[in-house]
């Protein structure tokens, strides 16, 4: 996430644009990317704690990733299937929504209409990091109770 933001900063400072853009507006999306990475690291650790084979871990996590992506795409594209998007872990990964609106980017909750609220940038990050930490806890419990095979 830091490398992505540094690349954005470098690009903005080496290219001439019609309207100047400050690199600091890209900090919330970079933090959202970090939170997604933290969740995926926790998920992968949790799956890895329960299996002996790297290929199986990669297959399970890759399949989960692909299914989650399909669920989010179908939830956005198919009328009447919007609810399906909420079953994906990509739901709190919305870096594009955090670029243009600083009040949304730096808040836990954001009022979209009177009486209607959505998660803000900090809320998105909290959900992803919280799920990642929960996965790490599950991984620790599973690994502590697991019978490891003897070395060959």
Regions found by a protein language model. Name each.
Residues 34-70, 74:
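A structural motif at transmembrane helix-loop-helix junctions in multipass membrane proteins
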Residues 57-142, 146-150:
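Terminal transmembrane helical anchor/hairpin motif
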Residues 22, 26-30, 34, 54, ...:
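Hydrophobic, aromatic-rich alpha-helical transmembrane segments
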Residues 1-45, 49-50:
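Secretory targeting signals
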């Amino acid at each position: 996430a830091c490398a992505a933001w540094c690349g954005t900063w470098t690009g903005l400072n080496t290219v001439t644009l019609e309207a100047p853009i400050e690199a600091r507006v890209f900090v919330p999306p970079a933090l959202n990317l970090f939170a997604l990475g933290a969740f995926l690291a926790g998920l992968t650790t949790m799956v890895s704690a329960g299996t002996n084979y790297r290929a199986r871990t990669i297959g399970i996590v890759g399949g989960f990733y692909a299914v989650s992506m399909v669920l989010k795409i179908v939830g956005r594209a198919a009328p009447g299937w919007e609810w399906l998007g909420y079953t994906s872990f990509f739901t709190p990964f919305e870096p594009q929504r955090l670029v243009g609106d600083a009040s949304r980017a730096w808040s836990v909750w954001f009022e979209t209409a009177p009486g209607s609220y959505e998660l803000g940038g900090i809320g998105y990050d909290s959900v992803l990091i919280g799920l990642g930490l929960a996965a790490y806890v599950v991984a620790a419990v599973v690994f502590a109770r697991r019978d490891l095979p003897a070395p060959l």
